[in-house]
Amino acid sequence: GGELQIGTFTITEPEIVSVDITWGSLEFKYQDGKWDPETCKYTESGWTTEQEDDASITVTNSGNVAVDVEYRFTTAEDLTEVEHLQGSFVDENEKPLDTLSVPADNMPRKTELRLESDKPTKSFDKTIGTITIVIKE
């Protein structure tokens, strides 16, 4: 005789990381505060966009594993027109974030870039920084 061996095999789906990233124009203008005669106060000055979604970055995870998405803003090295420019990111509830956990549910997750700085010394039209997005499993 021979020996009979019974084995158990598990077949698993391969892990698929598939992420779509879309973004608005990411064009910003610095707006000086203006006098509001109704409130007798100046409106807030700062960086604004033309359209509501211009500062947005949307990530959709169409894979089958959850991912972490890291957001980073780096000020352009040759930017001399603006002092102390900093970029940060907020989620859809305006909560600050550096990393967003995105489940594999094919639902879009929106993040927005917020800019803060001193008032620019003059008007200019050029790249003010770089956004880096890192996808991690």
What residue ranges belong to the model's regions?
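Generic preference for hydrophobic/aromatic residues in regular secondary structure cores
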Residues: 4, 8-11, 17-21, 71, ...
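An almost-null, non-specific background feature
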Residues: 18-20, 26-37, 66-68, 76-80, ...
